[in-house]
Each structure stands twice: as structure tokens, then as C-alpha cells.
Amino acid sequence: MATIILGSQWGDEGKGKLTDILCPSAEICARSAGGHNAGHSIVAQGVSYDFHLLPSGLVNPKCMNLIGSGVVFHVPSFFSELEKLEAKGLAGVRDRIFVSDRCQVNFDLHAAVDGLEEVELGERKIGTTGRGIGPSYSTKASRSGVRISEVFDEAVFERKLRQLADGYRKRFGDLLKYDVEEEIARFKEYRKLLPNYVVDAVKFIKDAQDQNRKILIEGANALMLDIDYGTYPYVTSSNPCLGGIITGLAINPRKIETIVGVVKAYTTRVGDGIFKTEDEGEIGTKLQDIGREWGVSTGRKRRCGWLDLVVVKYSAAINHYTSLNLTKLDVLDTFPTLKVAVAYKDPATGEELDFFPADLSLLERCEVVYKEFEGWNTPTTHIKKFEELPAQARQYVEFIEQYVGVKVGWIGTGPDREDMIYR
């Protein structure tokens, strides 16, 4: 049976910690979408490991790991990440990682194009990580990309990559700083190494599910960055939602047991795009400092603000969570008053929206309707039992459950793996 961990906001919710906790009981850990733009850290036996492209199930020596068909696969990052894990003493990683032969290859060409497209957009830039994720998915959708399976046919590979580079050069001219022959030469070496890792992922997952193996699926990014359901166009270029998990891994939906939505106890966002509860003053700065809000992948500081339950309720309607993992509750310990967004009010009509609209111009003009809570002003760090939380903290958690309609099954109360309440 499969357990799925999904981000319910704009990413950086703390999915990695729950993945780390659940990994020891998993036989397979898989990723379904995105690329090396994602990022989180896992602490195992006192050592911190950074993961971007690779599934974090690699910290479990008994767990096999799969990069699914929906991922855009940057080959240099794959090998460099493996090397970094080995350098930190993680044993046997090369024997426990597999890649779908249907993955699209994310070339350095795509990263070069990513930067040029952001410049082209000017003030309307998306705020991407610059890792070529969007251009990779664009070439996939236009059917001009290269699949991993095609890397092994040298003639086909070179023809398709040259065509891709020629097309971009016609568009950008001398602004495109990229040497296609250099990339082709690098892939001559990768072609020798990749066969050890590439598998038919459809058969891999089918066999695993037929044998009732325990599969843990870690979502990258989050629902509000989904290409269809997020704050378009300020989104990623894949589907980091439940639907994307099913298509990206060919998972049998009837064999999904648990879907966990990970929710930070406040809200953060990296890059541009609408963020109704953002606080650019003292509150936002305090959340940023206490929560250590800067990205693993980019180092960029995260925008911070109050918890937006309209967003969480919307994501629950799409991802159908069976439970929530509320993270970083302890970050709120010193706030005398807390706020959560429960609706958006259109000042033109007076109408209150309790569901996230597609029309961002409507959202822009809306005012946030907040519910205030009394803070608890006492440390919650390292607390392991719900009953030991201050009454105000319990009230905060219970209101989230009531509003979203999903039970909070886990509550993070600190940075360590052990700092988790189970309910």
C-alpha cells in the first residue's frame, strides 16, 4: 500500500521530516514530478543530508528508491548528489536508486533558456529557481524533448539535442550562451554509467504493488505551485498534486492508503506571485528569523505571513488528505496574538470567499478576513503529547481541523526528528 506526502501551501512546509520518520517502515521511496529544483534536509544519526533530485529514502539502508516518469532528470545533478551522500558516509546508495526510462532529460540548455526567459519577462518574471524546470516541461509538452531511453541511441540523442539547441538559438541568437557539442561529449560518459540505474518504472511499480510492498511517495513543491491548480502563472511546470503522483508513477489509486497534507503553522513562499497573508513588517521578519526561513535549493529568503486556511482548505479539496501534518508550531511560541485567514472579502461587492479563486485579479483586490487567537507565550519545543501543549495551542490546532475538515495527525514541535506529536 502507498503513503503519499504532499505540500499543501507553496512548498517548504517540512515534508522531509515526515518522510524521514516514515522511511524506516517503507520498502520503496519514490518521487513523481519536478526536478532538482526541490530541496530539503534530512538529519539521520546526527548527519545532515541535502536532497534535491534524489528521494530521501536513501537514508534508509533497506529502502529502494525510484525517480518516476513525471520527473525532469538532470543527469549531472543525479551523479553529484550521489557523490555528496557517499562523501558523508551514506553507504550503498548506488545500489538503491533507480530512474524511470520515461523521464525527460533536463539539459544544461534548459537552464540557460530558463534565465533568458526570466529576463524576457522583465517585471513579470516568475521567480524560478533557474534550474531549467519550466523549459524542460515545455519541450516535453511540445514533444521535442529527449527521454532517458533515447540517451542510449547515440544518433537519435544527438539529432534531437541539436534540433532543440538550434530552435532556441533561432529564438535567442547570441544571447544563448551554450555549447551543444560540450553537452553531447559529456553524455558520451553518462551513457556508460546510466544503464546501472535506468528501469521500466511502470513494471517496477506494478510489481511492487502486486507484492503489497510498502511504498512511500514524497511530493516535491506543493499544491499552490501546481501548473493547473496553483497561482498561475507563478507556479512550477508540473503537477505536485495527488493527480500528478498517480500519473508520474503509474500508482494504482485503489492501493493508496494514506494521503498526508503537510501544513506549516504559518505561511511562506519563495519567489514572486500572490500571497494574501504576507507580512512585510515586524511579524514577517520575526517568522523568518525564528523559523530560519531560507531555501535549501536557492538560499533565497522566504516571504512569511500568517496561516491561510483558505489555501489549506482548497488544497484539501484537490488532494483529498486523510490527515494533516502541522509543522513548526513552536515557531509561534512567542507571539502574543495569532491570526489565521478564514476568507477573502471583495470590497466591491462585500462578498466573502472561503475558497481560493482562479481569477487572481479578483484575489488581488480582496481583503483578508482573519480570525484572531490568543498566543500561548510558553515553549512548546520538544513536546511529545498533545495534552501537554498549552490550551491556546490546542485550540489553534483544533480550529485548523474544524475549518479544513481533516484531522491533524502529526504536529511538529521542533527541528529534530523526535520533535513530533502523534495523535
Curated annotation (Swiss-Prot):
The active site is at D12, H40. Binds 1 Mg(2+) ion per subunit. Its EC number is 6.3.4.4. The keyword Nucleotide-binding applies. It is found in: Cytoplasm. HAMAP family: Adenylosucc_synth. This is Adenylosuccinate synthetase. It comes from Pyricularia oryzae (strain 70-15 / ATCC MYA-4617 / FGSC 8958) (Rice blast fungus). The lineage of its organism: Eukaryota, Fungi, Dikarya, Ascomycota, Pezizomycotina.
